[in-house]
């Protein structure tokens, strides 16, 4: 069972990592080329997702080590530590998105910033992100339920956070 659990966990983390790499590259490029600060900010968010997915991979690899003299019960507690790391990233991302949103609304109200029309590419990548993250959320949540892995539960919540950010980007682009 442990081998199946480790395989499912690794597969889920790798799928999320690959998806975030692709989304980060696309959103950052389209945000720049499509003149959409909202999509660019979402691309930077996806880049930070890549960074902590790499950290999660390292934690998960270490958590799979067998028990030894110094750790007679094994290294599985690293999964909980990894979940805390993901939670810290989610909290930081949420605070950053909130602050940027308040700042943008303030600038629109006082007239410093004016609304701009973004390209169809910006809207397309925002919609694609919504669909991809929705799929990743349900898959990761399901795998977390099967494996009882706290890190996967945290990653599922991060996908949910990204879904909400994508909705905000879609609204901002439209």
Label for each model-derived stretch:
Residues 1-174:
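Alpha-helical transmembrane cores and adjacent cytosolic helix/loop segments
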